[in-house]
């Protein structure tokens, strides 16, 4: 890149610097970023591996989080939001069963002394972010033994998002077995 005239060289240099800046910015940003932020707390005095079964309850999802319309006037997209809690519970059940952490994993049943009960709620549901909080309760005393909070950013496809969240919840359940 040789400059023959005095004015042409700074102009070419500016264009090269601009092109370099734009390429750096485009490579530095991901198309979709599914960053999961989490908080995990285990408060149980008993060893978590002593539990032999897990009951998974549907997470609570209030309609105010995704619509302003009454139930009778929900759009197709808003109607799909009502199915998210059961999809999340089904996926968590599938992932936990695949890891064979517990002898029994179900979505219903009566808790016993060796049962953990997973409960939770959606705290934010939107186009760009889905947040959940969940707790594990001792089956005998209904005392909270563990807590987690997870947020998934840059939500584009709710089906994939629910799959990622359920995998993260199953990972949490697996990790706390050693605490």
Across the structure, where does each feature detected by a protein language model lie?
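Extracytoplasmic/secreted envelope proteins and their assembly/folding machinery
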Residues: 85, 89-93, 134, 162, ...
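A short, hydrophobic beta-strand-centered structural micro-motif
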Residues: 54-58, 106-127
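Bacterial N-terminal signal peptides
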Residues: 16-26
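Short beta-strand->alpha-helix linker/helix-N-cap micro-motif
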Residues: 93-112
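Short, surface-exposed coil-to-beta transition loops
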Residues: 128-133
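Bacterial N-terminal signal peptides that target proteins for export
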Residues: 3-17
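A structural "domain/chain start" motif
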Residues: 28-90, 145-147, 174-179
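Short secondary-structure boundary motifs at beta->alpha junctions and helix caps
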Residues: 73-79, 137-179
